[in-house]
């Protein structure tokens, strides 16, 4: 039926579409639909597709076309390629989304072929955009059947790459949720993402970019690492938070964009999500969006974490939740607990943290948050400053080298600091991160920042004192204190973060929470080690680290230790 439909579709759409080719604009919505209408007989056979086609084209064309239209650049891009591949591909995506189930729809691409001349472009532009942008269909398509169809169709791959890249990215940049989405999907892709994320780890090399324009260089990095990355960069740079939702959906397309070329085949097997999370997320989020902040940071965290996980955790701590969460949450704790944890975090958990949305979510969620928060600079800064911070943070370094202090310092420091000494320490530590984020650059680098940290934190502390009290009240909160602190670290809104420890997640971003919620155990522990992990890990963290409570209680000691 598909083939007949396709054949018919091909004929009819081809005929009709070509006929309307002039009506390319019309074809986008009307002619194509008209074609569909003509195909109605055929379409009737595939009523669903037809409905989808008609419905989607209309909606997609209307909706997507304007967006695409808006992203004129995209359509043009598609246009150049569209006639040849893009067009077929475009249509394919369109067909895919519309008739994802109906590979025939992709097969129907023939009209695409005919329209390839023009209609396809118009339709694909309008629809594929819809398809890819729609994200779900594309993902469904790539993931469901289209992947096969797309995979089967090199153009499709190109289409995916090009269209999703452009279309998805078109939306993605706006959605630019790469950060969050990947995390979301990351959990699934964690492993795959890990590999992909590993590059982020390689990202350390990109750290410079991170250090520089956290977002831009990584974009370079992303661009370098990921073909589509460049395109994705905008997403990363773009609203990291908002799009995420769509990200998951769009990610596949987005990932598809990258993936198809990279692994059109992989896409089907991996499913766009995998591809997307891995590459898309990675690329997009890898924590590069933040990752630039995060991966770099994460890389730093991981790399540094690995290299100087102890140092890094602190730095990561300053860096932001992700690194700090990963390193601090676990790596530091891992350090505290032992390299294994850190190694795990660093090796996998870290990567998992980084990769498994947890950290990536953390990185993404937090980094994104951090990036959004302004961690990018801070991430860069943190990464660097953190390093500097590490350098300058003898206390932190001490904390770091104390490992116990390190974790405790960061956690106890925050937790302990949160507890009693934590006031100054807490002020120092979270604010440090907070400062790290803003003043901390220099402050972070400088030891004085502690004073500054203390100084600003004083305000923050005062602000967050309640939270701190709350934080202090609850070990988990203390853990969260780390998290809030981390969040605070991540975001100056220490007050908000600390004050609203949950808000830390919320403040941090829903993703962290979502991530937490999403992969609370894994993501949470891995990614949110800071937030959830610390919150949840307190158990683990408690176990791993001297129990946040212990931490907290002993935290006094660690604090003293740290403080000392």
Swiss-Prot record:
Residues 250-271 have a biased composition (Pro residues). It comes from the Eukaryota. Residues 79-97, 114-134, 170-179, 272-299, 378-416 have a biased composition (Low complexity). One of its GO terms (cellular component) is extracellular space. Coiled coil: none annotated. Residues 1-564 are annotated as: Disordered. Residues 1-17, 153-168, 318-351, 467-564 have a biased composition (Polar residues). PANTHER family: APPLE DOMAIN-CONTAINING PROTEIN, YALI0C04136P. This is Uncharacterized protein DKFZp434B061. It comes from Homo sapiens (Human). The lineage of its organism: Eukaryota, Metazoa, Chordata, Craniata, Vertebrata.
